[in-house]
């Protein structure tokens, strides 16, 4: 097993996985998996429950060891999970500044909170936040570290539909500004198509399929090609579908040009 954490300037890719294997009780959850993610690329990962999506993300984050293979990731990375995981005894800005070293920690935390629209909540207690606000704090906590790799483990799954749309808009805007590579783990095919440059399907411990998403941004379900990609991904996931009318779930953005 080789685990390498080179400096970002020496990386040709933000993520390089070569034949990585991770076993639990003798069962290979990741089984000789290969994966590359380019700097600044937004990748979504789909798969059935138990397919190993979260295991892969936790492996990239350094939270799970690998049993075999080679893995290269940047030293500057951050993760946002489905649960915000805020410390209730620390005010919002102190949650954002966790792990930030130097005299400017508060200023950096305040700047990150302003980016996610929560400058007015910097002295609030986490228990007073809505679900969407708490996730925005978690996102600010990730961004304050200026990551070259941002890992998102179903961060929008527990949010209501309107808040999810707003979070989608926010994450795309921040991605365009900060340009990290992003790996989003999700069960939502539409979410993957709305956000990602490339969608991967994980099955049997390996990347079974990958589809480049060349649809113009901002995207919506009625964008030409969206429904065909959706049907293809659902087929790969073993979901039988019938033709349905397109529902407009557009993501209006202030920056409309594609990256």
UniProtKB/Swiss-Prot annotation:
It is found in: Cell inner membrane. Keywords: ATP-binding, Cell inner membrane, Cell membrane, Membrane, Nucleotide-binding, Translocase, Transport. It catalyses: ATP + H2O + aliphatic sulfonate-[sulfonate-binding protein]Side 1 = ADP + phosphate + aliphatic sulfonateSide 2 + [sulfonate-binding protein]Side 1. It comes from the Bacteria. Its EC number is 7.6.2.14. GO terms for cellular component: plasma membrane. Residues 15-229 form the ABC transporter domain. The keyword Secreted does not apply. One of its GO terms (molecular function) is ATP binding. Pfam families: ABC_tran (PF00005). ATP binds at residues 47-54. It is an enzyme of class 7 (translocase). It is a peripheral membrane protein. Signal peptide: none annotated. Belongs to the ABC transporter superfamily. Aliphatic sulfonates importer (TC 3.A.1.17.2) family. The complex is composed of two ATP-binding proteins (SsuB), two transmembrane proteins (SsuC) and a solute-binding protein (SsuA). Part of the ABC transporter complex SsuABC involved in aliphatic sulfonates import. Responsible for energy coupling to the transport system. PANTHER family: ALIPHATIC SULFONATES IMPORT ATP-BINDING PROTEIN SSUB, TAURINE IMPORT ATP-BINDING PROTEIN-RELATED. This is Aliphatic sulfonates import ATP-binding protein SsuB 1. It comes from Pseudomonas fluorescens (strain ATCC BAA-477 / NRRL B-23932 / Pf-5).
């Amino acid at each position: 097993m080789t685990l390498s954490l080179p400096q970002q300037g020496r990386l040709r890719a933000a993520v390089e996985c070569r034949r990585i294997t991770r076993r639990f009780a003798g069962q290979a959850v990741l089984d000789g998996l290969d994966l590359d993610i380019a700097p600044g690329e937004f990748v979504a990962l789909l798969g059935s429950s138990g397919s190993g999506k979260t295991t892969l993300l936790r492996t990239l984050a350094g939270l799970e060891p690998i049993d075999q293979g080679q893995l290269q990731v940047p030293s500057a990375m951050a993760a946002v999970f489905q649960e915000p995981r805020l410390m209730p005894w620390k005010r919002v800005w102190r949650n954002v500044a966790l792990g930030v070293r130097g005299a400017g920690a508060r200023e950096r935390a305040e700047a990150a909170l302003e980016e996610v629209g929560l400058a007015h909540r910097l002295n609030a207690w986490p228990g007073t936040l809505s679900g969407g606000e708490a996730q925005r704090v978690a996102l600010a906590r990730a961004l304050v570290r200026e990551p070259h790799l941002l890992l998102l483990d179903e961060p929008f799954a527990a949010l209501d539909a309107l808040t999810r749309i707003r979070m989608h808009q926010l994450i795309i805007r921040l991605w365009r500004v900060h340009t990290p590579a992003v790996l989003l783990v999700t069960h939502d095919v539409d979410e993957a198509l709305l956000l990602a440059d490339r969608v991967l399907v994980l099955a049997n411990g390996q990347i079974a399929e990958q589809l480049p998403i060349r649809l113009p941004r901002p995207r919506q379900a009625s964008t030409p090609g969206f429904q065909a990609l959706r049907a293809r991904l659902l087929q790969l996931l073993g979901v039988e579908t019938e033709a349905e009318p397109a529902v407009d779930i557009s993501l209006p953005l202030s920056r409309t040009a594609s990256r």
